[in-house]
Amino acid sequence: CTHNSRRSHLSQVWAQTMANYFNIKNVFCYSGGTEATALFPMVAETLQNSGFQINTISKNENPVYSIKYSNNEHPIIGFSKKLDDEFNPKSEFAAIMTCSQADGGCPFIAGAEKRIPITFEDPKIFDSTPQQAEKYNERSMQIATELFHVFSQINS
């Protein structure tokens, strides 16, 4: 995504969760954007409301979160970063584009073996509205449902 603040994090967390659920080994999910901003707090709250354990590791302009999807697995480390951040892989990965703006603006992702657009509407348009929590949950569940289908089709 462009700002690596909402959809890409929801997708990272749900993809890693689905890989674990379907017992697909050697899948490690990351997120990145064309810009680094911050993981939007409503994303962490939405994930927590869906049953994930969320802990803030560091509080600053770009907080770092520990996101547990299973008691027996390492947590996902969530923070906003650019696609080429040292935290992300440099080669042998598939780039899933969750934002149509980034999909159009990034025709080439260095190191990606595959580039797959699965775009979602940005829940940002509901920030600071009475529908915010509902719409973030709706988007999170849409992403979870799509990724459930994707990972159910993979033969481990």
PLM features: residue spans?
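Short polar/charged helix/loop
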Residues: 5-156
